[in-house]
């Protein structure tokens, strides 16, 4: 009786993910002093692909370089173009990092058409008290 239950196995059906064609999307570039994060979404905000300088193998102070931002943006663009057929994007840039401009140049070099570039860095209208100034 127990042997019959063991021999019956249910086969799981695995559905393949459908390849969505997204001709237009948004690119969010967050350039901090320590890292650069590139996220590519469709127009509704659903993530298609992402990449960071750290995920590209850069460590420590090399993560914050323009070259690391260029490699990360290029990788994210390649993934988005391959998986979703992305062609044109709106770019939202935030943060004070030095990888902002090189990341945008990398997107153009990969063949994405940029329709709009917008700086969405959050600036307070004299809100919370900032942390103390760094003295070197």
From Swiss-Prot:
One of its GO terms (molecular function) is rRNA binding. It holds the Pfam family Ribosomal_S11. GO terms for cellular component: ribonucleoprotein complex; ribosome. Keywords: Ribonucleoprotein, Ribosomal protein, RNA-binding, rRNA-binding. One of its GO terms (biological process) is translation. It comes from the Bacteria. Located on the platform of the 30S subunit, it bridges several disparate RNA helices of the 16S rRNA. Forms part of the Shine-Dalgarno cleft in the 70S ribosome. Part of the 30S ribosomal subunit. Interacts with proteins S7 and S18. Binds to IF-3. NCBIfam families: PRK05309.1, uS11_bact. Belongs to the universal ribosomal protein uS11 family. This is Small ribosomal subunit protein uS11.
């Amino acid at each position: 009786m127990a042997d019959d239950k063991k021999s019956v196995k249910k086969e799981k059906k695995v559905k393949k993910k459908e390849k969505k064609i997204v001709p237009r999307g948004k690119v969010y570039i967050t350039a901090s002093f320590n890292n650069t994060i590139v996220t590519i979404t469709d127009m509704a905000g659903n993530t298609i692909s992402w990449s960071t300088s750290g995920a590209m193998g850069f460590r420590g102070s090399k993560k914050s370089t323009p070259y690391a931002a260029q490699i990360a943006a290029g990788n994210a663009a390649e993934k988005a173009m391959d998986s979703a057929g992305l062609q044109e994007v709106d770019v939202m840039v935030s943060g004070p990092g030095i990888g902002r401009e090189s990341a945008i140049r990398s997107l153009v070099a990969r063949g994405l058409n940029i329709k709009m570039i917008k700086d969405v860095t959050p600036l307070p209208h004299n809100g919370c008290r900032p942390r103390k100034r760094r003295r070197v």
